[in-house]
Amino acid sequence: MRKWYEMEACNQGPIIGGQVYLVRNIMGYPFEAKMNEEEQKALMAAVCYAVRQSEEVLQKKFVFINFSEVRDYEQQALTGKLAIPPQMFEKGHEAGILISEDESISVLVNGKEHLCIQVSCPGNHIQEAMALAGQVDDCLNQYLKYAFSKKYGYLTSSPLYMGTGMSASYLLHLPYLEKKSVMHQIEKQISQYGFTLRPHFDGQTEAPGSVYRMRNRKTLGLSESEITSALEHLAGQLAEQEEALARQCFNEDRLCQVDPMYRAYGLIKYARKLGYDETMACLSLLHAGDLYHIWPEQAEICPFAVMLNMADAVLSASAEKNISSSERGRARADYIRRNLPVLDASEAVSS
Protein backbone atom coordinates (compact mmCIF):
# COMPACT_ATOMS: atom_id res chain seq x y z
CA MET A 1 0.00 0.00 0.00
CA ARG A 2 1.30 3.45 -0.93
CA LYS A 3 2.03 5.73 2.00
CA TRP A 4 0.52 9.20 2.16
CA TYR A 5 3.92 10.82 1.56
CA GLU A 6 4.36 8.82 -1.67
CA MET A 7 1.29 10.39 -3.28
CA GLU A 8 1.64 12.66 -6.31
CA ALA A 9 0.09 15.59 -4.42
CA CYS A 10 3.28 15.86 -2.33
CA ASN A 11 5.14 16.96 -5.47
CA GLN A 12 2.63 19.37 -7.03
CA GLY A 13 3.50 22.61 -5.27
CA PRO A 14 5.55 24.26 -2.53
CA ILE A 15 3.08 22.84 0.01
CA ILE A 16 4.26 19.23 0.42
CA GLY A 17 1.67 18.08 2.93
CA GLY A 18 -0.09 18.82 6.18
CA GLN A 19 -0.71 17.29 9.58
CA VAL A 20 -3.39 17.74 12.22
CA TYR A 21 -2.86 16.72 15.86
CA LEU A 22 -5.58 16.31 18.48
CA VAL A 23 -4.34 16.01 22.06
CA ARG A 24 -6.65 14.30 24.53
CA ASN A 25 -6.50 13.12 28.14
CA ILE A 26 -8.79 10.47 29.58
CA MET A 27 -10.99 10.86 32.66
CA GLY A 28 -10.04 8.59 35.54
CA TYR A 29 -6.30 8.73 34.90
CA PRO A 30 -3.78 11.25 36.28
CA PHE A 31 -1.71 13.29 33.83
CA GLU A 32 1.25 11.42 32.34
CA ALA A 33 3.83 12.90 34.73
CA LYS A 34 1.98 11.34 37.69
CA MET A 35 1.00 8.00 36.17
CA ASN A 36 2.57 4.77 37.34
CA GLU A 37 3.40 1.85 35.05
CA GLU A 38 0.20 -0.05 35.83
CA GLU A 39 -1.95 2.97 34.96
CA GLN A 40 -0.02 3.50 31.73
CA LYS A 41 -0.53 -0.14 30.72
CA ALA A 42 -4.24 0.05 31.56
CA LEU A 43 -4.61 3.21 29.48
CA MET A 44 -2.76 1.64 26.58
CA ALA A 45 -5.07 -1.38 26.65
CA ALA A 46 -8.15 0.87 26.71
CA VAL A 47 -6.94 2.92 23.74
CA CYS A 48 -5.98 -0.17 21.74
CA TYR A 49 -9.47 -1.56 22.31
CA ALA A 50 -11.08 1.72 21.20
CA VAL A 51 -8.98 1.85 18.01
CA ARG A 52 -9.70 -1.80 17.15
CA GLN A 53 -13.43 -1.20 17.59
CA SER A 54 -13.18 1.82 15.25
CA GLU A 55 -11.38 0.12 12.34
CA GLU A 56 -14.55 -0.80 10.45
CA VAL A 57 -16.00 2.71 10.64
CA LEU A 58 -12.70 4.33 9.66
CA GLN A 59 -12.07 1.70 6.97
CA LYS A 60 -8.48 1.44 8.15
CA LYS A 61 -6.41 -1.36 9.63
CA PHE A 62 -3.99 -0.38 12.39
CA VAL A 63 -0.69 -1.88 13.50
CA PHE A 64 0.26 -1.54 17.18
CA ILE A 65 3.87 -0.90 18.18
CA ASN A 66 4.92 -0.99 21.83
CA PHE A 67 8.01 1.19 22.25
CA SER A 68 9.30 -1.00 25.06
CA GLU A 69 9.68 -3.79 22.50
CA VAL A 70 11.53 -1.89 19.76
CA ARG A 71 15.06 -0.57 19.45
CA ASP A 72 15.82 3.15 19.65
CA TYR A 73 16.55 3.45 15.94
CA GLU A 74 13.19 1.83 15.13
CA GLN A 75 11.38 4.44 17.22
CA GLN A 76 13.52 7.19 15.64
CA ALA A 77 12.61 5.84 12.20
CA LEU A 78 8.91 6.25 13.01
CA THR A 79 9.60 9.84 14.08
CA GLY A 80 11.63 10.45 10.92
CA LYS A 81 8.81 9.16 8.73
CA LEU A 82 6.38 11.52 10.51
CA ALA A 83 4.33 8.77 12.19
CA ILE A 84 5.22 10.06 15.67
CA PRO A 85 4.82 13.77 16.49
CA PRO A 86 8.21 14.50 18.11
CA GLN A 87 6.81 17.34 20.21
CA MET A 88 4.47 14.84 21.90
CA PHE A 89 6.84 11.92 22.46
CA GLU A 90 8.71 11.50 25.73
CA LYS A 91 11.22 8.71 26.14
CA GLY A 92 10.97 6.46 29.18
CA HIS A 93 7.20 6.13 29.31
CA GLU A 94 5.25 2.90 28.81
CA ALA A 95 4.26 4.26 25.42
CA GLY A 96 3.01 2.85 22.14
CA ILE A 97 1.50 3.84 18.83
CA LEU A 98 -1.20 2.56 16.50
CA ILE A 99 -0.54 3.33 12.83
CA SER A 100 -2.75 2.83 9.78
CA GLU A 101 -1.28 0.87 6.87
CA ASP A 102 -0.85 3.99 4.72
CA GLU A 103 0.59 5.85 7.75
CA SER A 104 -1.94 8.67 7.30
CA ILE A 105 -3.39 8.10 10.80
CA SER A 106 -1.49 7.43 13.99
CA VAL A 107 -2.57 7.37 17.63
CA LEU A 108 0.25 7.93 20.10
CA VAL A 109 -0.49 6.60 23.60
CA ASN A 110 1.29 7.74 26.78
CA GLY A 111 3.30 10.49 25.17
CA LYS A 112 3.44 13.83 26.98
CA GLU A 113 -0.36 13.57 27.13
CA HIS A 114 -2.55 10.46 27.22
CA LEU A 115 -3.40 10.55 23.52
CA CYS A 116 -2.26 12.31 20.39
CA ILE A 117 -4.31 11.61 17.27
CA GLN A 118 -2.35 12.57 14.17
CA VAL A 119 -3.68 12.70 10.61
CA SER A 120 -1.36 13.42 7.68
CA CYS A 121 -2.34 14.48 4.17
CA PRO A 122 -0.44 15.04 0.92
CA GLY A 123 -0.50 18.51 -0.61
CA ASN A 124 -2.76 21.37 0.36
CA HIS A 125 -5.59 19.40 2.00
CA ILE A 126 -5.53 20.39 5.67
CA GLN A 127 -9.34 20.67 5.84
CA GLU A 128 -9.72 17.04 4.72
CA ALA A 129 -7.14 16.03 7.34
CA MET A 130 -9.07 17.98 9.98
CA ALA A 131 -12.32 16.23 9.01
CA LEU A 132 -10.69 12.80 9.23
CA ALA A 133 -9.06 13.66 12.57
CA GLY A 134 -12.50 14.67 13.84
CA GLN A 135 -13.92 11.34 12.71
CA VAL A 136 -11.16 9.42 14.50
CA ASP A 137 -11.71 11.58 17.58
CA ASP A 138 -15.46 10.87 17.61
CA CYS A 139 -14.89 7.13 17.19
CA LEU A 140 -12.46 6.92 20.11
CA ASN A 141 -14.65 9.14 22.28
CA GLN A 142 -17.38 6.48 22.14
CA TYR A 143 -15.09 4.20 24.18
CA LEU A 144 -12.93 6.72 26.07
CA LYS A 145 -14.27 9.60 28.17
CA TYR A 146 -12.18 12.69 27.47
CA ALA A 147 -11.20 15.17 30.19
CA PHE A 148 -13.11 18.30 29.18
CA SER A 149 -14.10 21.56 30.85
CA LYS A 150 -16.88 23.84 29.59
CA LYS A 151 -14.72 26.79 30.59
CA TYR A 152 -11.27 25.70 29.36
CA GLY A 153 -12.03 23.07 26.73
CA TYR A 154 -9.93 19.91 26.55
CA LEU A 155 -7.76 19.60 29.66
CA THR A 156 -4.06 19.05 29.03
CA SER A 157 -0.95 19.10 31.19
CA SER A 158 0.65 21.61 28.80
CA PRO A 159 -1.04 25.01 28.40
CA LEU A 160 0.07 24.93 24.75
CA TYR A 161 -2.76 22.52 23.89
CA MET A 162 -5.43 23.81 26.28
CA GLY A 163 -8.67 24.71 24.52
CA THR A 164 -9.28 22.81 21.30
CA GLY A 165 -6.32 20.52 22.05
CA MET A 166 -5.55 20.88 18.38
CA SER A 167 -2.40 21.73 16.47
CA ALA A 168 -1.97 21.87 12.71
CA SER A 169 1.02 22.25 10.45
CA TYR A 170 2.12 22.37 6.84
CA LEU A 171 5.40 21.20 5.33
CA LEU A 172 6.68 23.59 2.68
CA HIS A 173 9.52 23.40 0.16
CA LEU A 174 10.96 26.93 -0.14
CA PRO A 175 14.34 26.85 -1.95
CA TYR A 176 13.89 30.11 -3.89
CA LEU A 177 12.81 32.13 -0.85
CA GLU A 178 15.72 30.55 0.99
CA LYS A 179 18.19 31.65 -1.70
CA LYS A 180 16.90 35.19 -1.37
CA SER A 181 17.95 35.13 2.33
CA VAL A 182 14.54 36.25 3.58
CA MET A 183 13.61 33.24 5.73
CA HIS A 184 14.47 34.85 9.08
CA GLN A 185 12.39 37.88 8.15
CA ILE A 186 9.48 35.64 7.12
CA GLU A 187 9.75 33.66 10.38
CA LYS A 188 9.35 36.91 12.34
CA GLN A 189 6.32 37.95 10.28
CA ILE A 190 4.69 34.53 10.69
CA SER A 191 5.18 34.65 14.47
CA GLN A 192 3.02 37.80 14.66
CA TYR A 193 0.05 35.68 13.61
CA GLY A 194 0.64 33.03 16.27
CA PHE A 195 2.50 30.57 14.05
CA THR A 196 6.07 29.30 13.87
CA LEU A 197 8.12 28.55 10.76
CA ARG A 198 11.16 26.35 11.34
CA PRO A 199 13.39 23.99 9.32
CA HIS A 200 11.82 20.54 9.47
CA PHE A 201 14.84 18.27 9.11
CA ASP A 202 17.90 18.21 11.35
CA GLY A 203 21.33 18.35 9.75
CA GLN A 204 24.60 20.20 9.54
CA THR A 205 23.14 22.74 7.13
CA GLU A 206 20.60 25.30 8.34
CA ALA A 207 17.57 23.78 6.58
CA PRO A 208 18.30 20.41 4.91
CA GLY A 209 16.28 19.99 1.74
CA SER A 210 14.88 23.55 2.07
CA VAL A 211 11.87 21.99 3.84
CA TYR A 212 10.13 24.05 6.53
CA ARG A 213 7.26 23.35 8.92
CA MET A 214 4.64 26.00 9.73
CA ARG A 215 2.67 25.32 12.93
CA ASN A 216 0.25 27.14 15.23
CA ARG A 217 1.65 28.13 18.64
CA LYS A 218 -1.55 28.17 20.73
CA THR A 219 -5.05 26.71 20.80
CA LEU A 220 -6.76 28.45 23.74
CA GLY A 221 -9.36 30.98 22.59
CA LEU A 222 -9.28 29.79 18.96
CA SER A 223 -11.62 27.41 17.17
CA GLU A 224 -10.32 24.56 15.04
CA SER A 225 -11.59 26.23 11.87
CA GLU A 226 -9.86 29.50 12.79
CA ILE A 227 -6.54 27.67 13.22
CA THR A 228 -6.76 25.73 9.95
CA SER A 229 -8.04 28.73 7.96
CA ALA A 230 -5.19 30.94 9.19
CA LEU A 231 -2.69 28.17 8.43
CA GLU A 232 -4.07 27.74 4.91
CA HIS A 233 -3.93 31.47 4.29
CA LEU A 234 -0.35 31.94 5.51
CA ALA A 235 0.95 28.81 3.78
CA GLY A 236 -0.82 29.84 0.59
CA GLN A 237 0.85 33.25 0.66
CA LEU A 238 4.28 31.67 1.10
CA ALA A 239 3.60 29.21 -1.72
CA GLU A 240 2.62 32.07 -4.04
CA GLN A 241 5.80 33.98 -3.19
CA GLU A 242 7.92 30.87 -3.79
CA GLU A 243 6.29 30.18 -7.15
CA ALA A 244 6.63 33.80 -8.26
CA LEU A 245 10.36 33.79 -7.47
CA ALA A 246 10.83 30.48 -9.29
CA ARG A 247 9.04 31.78 -12.40
CA GLN A 248 11.19 34.88 -12.36
CA CYS A 249 14.40 32.81 -12.16
CA PHE A 250 13.26 30.46 -14.93
CA ASN A 251 12.28 33.36 -17.18
CA GLU A 252 15.63 35.08 -16.65
CA ASP A 253 17.81 32.02 -17.34
CA ARG A 254 16.10 28.66 -17.65
CA LEU A 255 19.32 26.76 -18.37
CA CYS A 256 20.90 28.13 -15.18
CA GLN A 257 17.99 26.63 -13.21
CA VAL A 258 17.71 23.32 -15.06
CA ASP A 259 21.41 22.38 -15.24
CA PRO A 260 21.90 21.95 -11.43
CA MET A 261 18.76 19.79 -11.33
CA TYR A 262 20.15 17.32 -13.87
CA ARG A 263 23.54 17.38 -12.17
CA ALA A 264 21.84 16.55 -8.85
CA TYR A 265 19.93 13.69 -10.46
CA GLY A 266 23.10 12.25 -12.00
CA LEU A 267 25.02 12.49 -8.73
CA ILE A 268 22.56 10.69 -6.48
CA LYS A 269 21.30 8.25 -9.12
CA TYR A 270 24.73 6.80 -9.82
CA ALA A 271 26.72 7.46 -6.63
CA ARG A 272 27.90 4.50 -4.56
CA LYS A 273 28.14 6.38 -1.26
CA LEU A 274 26.13 9.42 -0.18
CA GLY A 275 26.15 11.72 2.84
CA TYR A 276 22.88 12.93 4.35
CA ASP A 277 23.21 16.66 3.74
CA GLU A 278 24.48 16.41 0.17
CA THR A 279 21.64 14.03 -0.65
CA MET A 280 19.07 16.40 0.86
CA ALA A 281 20.45 19.26 -1.26
CA CYS A 282 20.17 17.11 -4.41
CA LEU A 283 16.65 15.94 -3.54
CA SER A 284 15.60 19.55 -3.04
CA LEU A 285 16.70 20.27 -6.62
CA LEU A 286 14.84 17.19 -7.85
CA HIS A 287 11.71 18.35 -6.02
CA ALA A 288 11.97 21.76 -7.71
CA GLY A 289 12.47 20.03 -11.07
CA ASP A 290 9.37 17.91 -10.52
CA LEU A 291 7.37 20.93 -9.43
CA TYR A 292 8.34 22.97 -12.50
CA HIS A 293 7.89 20.08 -14.96
CA ILE A 294 11.53 19.47 -15.83
CA TRP A 295 11.25 15.68 -15.75
CA PRO A 296 9.35 13.51 -18.25
CA GLU A 297 5.70 13.10 -17.26
CA GLN A 298 5.97 9.33 -16.85
CA ALA A 299 9.00 9.59 -14.55
CA GLU A 300 7.69 8.94 -11.04
CA ILE A 301 10.13 10.93 -8.94
CA CYS A 302 8.98 11.28 -5.32
CA PRO A 303 11.72 13.40 -3.70
CA PHE A 304 9.93 13.93 -0.38
CA ALA A 305 9.34 10.20 0.12
CA VAL A 306 13.03 9.60 -0.61
CA MET A 307 13.97 12.30 1.93
CA LEU A 308 12.06 10.42 4.61
CA ASN A 309 13.23 6.94 3.69
CA MET A 310 16.96 7.66 3.40
CA ALA A 311 17.36 9.18 6.88
CA ASP A 312 19.90 7.52 9.19
CA ALA A 313 17.42 5.83 11.54
CA VAL A 314 15.21 4.62 8.68
CA LEU A 315 18.21 3.01 6.97
CA SER A 316 19.15 1.29 10.25
CA ALA A 317 15.57 0.08 10.68
CA SER A 318 15.59 -1.30 7.12
CA ALA A 319 18.85 -3.12 7.85
CA GLU A 320 17.42 -4.32 11.19
CA LYS A 321 20.58 -3.23 12.97
CA ASN A 322 22.31 -0.02 14.02
CA ILE A 323 24.64 0.48 11.04
CA SER A 324 27.79 2.64 10.97
CA SER A 325 28.15 5.98 9.19
CA SER A 326 30.05 4.34 6.33
CA GLU A 327 27.42 1.62 5.99
CA ARG A 328 24.67 4.25 5.97
CA GLY A 329 26.41 6.08 3.12
CA ARG A 330 26.40 2.91 1.02
CA ALA A 331 22.86 1.96 2.05
CA ARG A 332 21.62 5.46 1.19
CA ALA A 333 23.14 5.29 -2.30
CA ASP A 334 21.75 1.78 -2.83
CA TYR A 335 18.26 2.86 -1.76
CA ILE A 336 18.26 5.87 -4.09
CA ARG A 337 19.52 3.88 -7.09
CA ARG A 338 16.65 1.44 -6.57
CA ASN A 339 13.99 4.10 -6.13
CA LEU A 340 14.88 6.87 -8.59
CA PRO A 341 13.70 6.06 -12.12
CA VAL A 342 16.11 6.00 -15.04
CA LEU A 343 15.38 9.07 -17.17
CA ASP A 344 15.21 8.69 -20.93
CA ALA A 345 17.15 11.68 -22.28
CA SER A 346 15.05 11.68 -25.46
CA GLU A 347 11.91 12.29 -23.37
CA ALA A 348 13.36 14.95 -21.08
CA VAL A 349 11.85 18.41 -21.21
CA SER A 350 13.97 20.72 -23.32
CA SER A 351 16.07 23.23 -21.44
Annotated model-derived regions:
Residues 1-151, 166, 180, 184-187, ...:
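Long, Pro/Ser/Thr-rich low-complexity/intrinsically disordered regulatory tracts in eukaryotic proteins
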Residues 153-170:
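Conserved phosphate/anionic-ligand binding catalytic regions in large, soluble enzymes, centered on
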